[in-house]
Curated annotation (Swiss-Prot):
Subcellular location: Cytoplasm
Name of protein: Urease subunit alpha
Keyword Metal-binding: yes
InterPro entries: Amidohydro-rel (IPR006680), Metal-dep_hydrolase_composite (IPR011059), Metal_Hydrolase (IPR032466), Urease_alpha_N_dom (IPR011612), Urease_alpha_subunit (IPR050112), Urease_AS (IPR017950), Urease_asu (IPR005848), Urease_asu_c (IPR017951)
Reaction catalysis annotation: urea + 2 H2O + H(+) = hydrogencarbonate + 2 NH4(+)
A Pfam family that the UniProt record links to this protein: Amidohydro_1
Domain Urease: 133-571
GO cellular component terms listed in the entry, alphabetical order: cytoplasm
Record: residues binding substrate: 223
Organism, scientific name: Corynebacterium efficiens (strain DSM 44549 / YS-314 / AJ 12310 / JCM 11189 / NBRC 100395)
Pathway the protein takes part in: Nitrogen metabolism; urea degradation; CO(2) and NH(3) from urea (urease route): step 1/1
Matching SUPFAM superfamilies: Composite domain of metallo-dependent hydrolases (SSF51338), Metallo-dependent hydrolases (SSF51556)
Entries under PROSITE patterns matching the protein: UREASE_1, UREASE_2, UREASE_3
Gene for this chain: ureC
Oxidoreductase recorded as keyword: no
Length: 571
């Protein structure tokens, strides 16, 4: 019987069960738990390779007569998902993941689950890593250029609010009122990015809130700059319960209308999505972080404080003054800014992520956050925590699968769950929309190799278009065919609430995109979130700002050196 070494097998077909991959220049190692492809029957495309007519490709079945034939197969790829780290072929049809297993020709190959046909295209995944597209639930739609910056970082869904560079958009993730919501839905219709908008959750009666939901808002945002009072929070949640949408909250830093206990009482056990729950981005000073222990709170971080480094505190003051329209010549404004920037709570934030207490990472784009760094900074936290805290339970020095799955969940499945869109996006599984990101391991988390939306390549590393092959320098991220023409109408999604779809908003506005409903939000608890659902008792000392979890002091050292940083951006 023929045999080959692991090294030779990995060079031809990619790694297999038991092999390990280092993720870029981090100290994290992913070990392949299972190989769903069949040894000796691997589907590989190219000259003299397997996927040829009569061999690995079936030559007589049509797409119409065989509903299992995919439009695209990604071969021999390492899937890195909250659900597992494994090797498989991925079949995609009509923009949906239809098969995860072994691809080939059922007439000539045994054990295949994904038939390759005449209508099938091949993307070579050998030696590469595949993740679900990232989801950022904290977007200030200030500049349309954010969309490309997010896309080339691996983000395929952006949820938030705004109207452009207005003062209130620079401060709050809110698209206020039906007219602005409709104009933004029209504006965003042609971009290769899934979109959901948040309306303004600030009213004294239900009607103005309901108007925004009927207009297309998939959530309401409550923000202190508009007045995050207990009454405002309570009313927004009451309306959200009626229409099955999310409420996102940035609480009252100044404690003008009440303290964290007042907000907890106003929430009243109802599910809510808290933004920058550590507090530097805003929220009850100094103890908003305590809400992360509540079973009904879905806590997120924004990326400026992730990970905690020697530069974190210093950069925040100027950033905060700009984002919240504060005046450095006014002592009260400076005091407001100072109250939000606390070394002790920032130092606890990374540890809370590592313990699975903080559940989601997001950007706060151009409003104290960097839209293209959600994924980078998530993995920088994971690396920093491994270096400081050692392996998670069940991991070893050479295998970090539990930590890796916990962290990938923070920007994929968990934000999808929080916004009621996990039935469509957020993970690599059959039946989900094929928003997928392909990575070379040496660039994992920092520079994707290829981004697919709805099964179509929308952006990729590409060399000089006038060259004889695709790879000559300069290799840059460039929009691909899926970003042009009317392709985005099928490869990108606008998420709407049920009531807006029933009211015919897509038809009224002439939207050409795929429309999907958000739902299942109001029954969520923190336990619904994958691998990040811990609910301990969290206490902040009101004088020292020290954070304790079930009585134990929680802190970490600021990082002086990070992976996924300068060496990847020299040119």
């Amino acid at each position: 019987m023929f045999s080959m070494s692991r090294k030779q097998h990995a060079s031809m077909y990619g790694p297999t069960t038991g092999d390990r991959l280092r993720l870029a220049d981090t100290g994290l190692f992913a070990e392949i738990e299972e190989d769903l492809t069949i040894a000796g029957e691997e589907a590989v495309f190219g000259g003299g390779k397997v996927v040829r007519v009569g061999m690995g490709q079936n030559g007589h079945r049509t797409r119409e007569e065989d509903p299992d034939i995919p439009d695209t197969v990604i071969t021999n790829v390492i899937v890195l998902d909250w659900s597992g780290i494994y090797k498989a072929d991925i079949g995609i049809r009509d923009g949906i993941i239809t098969g995860i297993g072994h691809a080939g020709n059922p007439d000539t190959m045994d054990g295949g689950t994904i038939p390759i046909g005449v209508s099938t295209d091949i993307i070579a995944g050998e030696g590469k890593v595949l993740t679900a597209g990232g989801i950022d639930t904290h977007i200030h739609f200030i500049s349309p250029e954010q969309i490309e910056a997010a896309l080339v970082s691996g983000i395929t869904t952006m949820i938030g609010g705004g109207t452009g560079p207005s003062e209130s958009t620079k401060a709050t993730t809110i698209t206020p009122g039906p007219w602005h919501i409709h104009q933004m839905l029209r504006s965003l219709d042609g971009f290769p990015m899934n979109i959901g908008l948040l309306g303004k959750g600030h009213a004294t009666a239900s009607a103005p809130l309901i108007d925004q939901i009927r207009a297309g808002a998939i959530g309401l945002k409550v923000h202190e700059d508009w007045g995050a009072t207990p009454a405002t929070i309570d009313l927004s949640l009451s309306v959200a319960d009626e229409f099955d949408i999310q409420v996102a909250v940035h609480t009252d830093t100044l404690n003008e209308a009440g303290f964290v206990e007042s907000t907890r009482e106003a929430i009243g056990g109802r599910v809510i999505h808290t933004f920058h729950t550590e507090g530097a981005g805003g929220g009850h000073a100094p103890d908003i972080i305590a809400l992360a222990g509540e079973p009904n709170v879905l806590p997120a971080s924004t990326n400026p404080t992730l990970p905690y480094t020697v530069n974190t505190v210093e950069e925040h003051l100027d950033m905060l003054m700009v984002c919240h329209h504060l005046n450095p010549d006014v002592p009260e404004d400076v005091a407001f800014a100072d109250s939000r920037i606390r070394t002790e709570t920032i130092a606890a934030e990374d540890v809370l992520h590592d313990m699975g207490i903080f559940s989601i990472t997001s950007s706060d784009s151009q409003a104290m956050g960097r839209v293209g760094e959600v994924i980078i900074r998530t993995w920088q936290v994971a690396d920093s925590m491994k270096r400081q805290r050692g392996p998670l339970e069940g991991d070893t020095a050479d295998s970090d699968n539990n930590r890796i799955k916990r962290y990938v969940a923070k920007y994929t499945i968990n934000p999808a769950l929080a916004q009621g869109i996990s039935h469509v996006v957020g993970s690599v599984e059959t039946g989900k929309f094929a928003d997928l990101v392909l990575w070379e391991p040496k660039f994992f988390g920092v520079k994707p190799f290829m981004i697919l939306k709805g099964g179509q390549v929308v952006n990729s590393i590409m060399g000089d278009a006038g060259a004889s092959i695709p790879t000559p320098q300069p290799e840059l991220y460039r929009p691909m065919f899926g970003s042009y023409g009317s392709a985005t109408s099928s490869n990108s999604i606008t998420f709407l609430p049920r009531v807006a779809i029933a009211a015919g908003i897509p038809e009224q506005l002439g939207l050409n995109r795929r429309i999907e409903e958000c739902h299942g939000i109001r029954t969520l608890t923190k336990q619904s979130l994958k691998l990040n659902g811990e609910t301990p008792s969290i206490h902040v000392d009101p004088e020292t700002y020290e954070v304790r979890i079930d009585g134990a002091l929680i802190t970490c050292e600021p990082a002086e050196k990070l992976p996924l940083a300068q060496r990847y951006f020299l040119f």
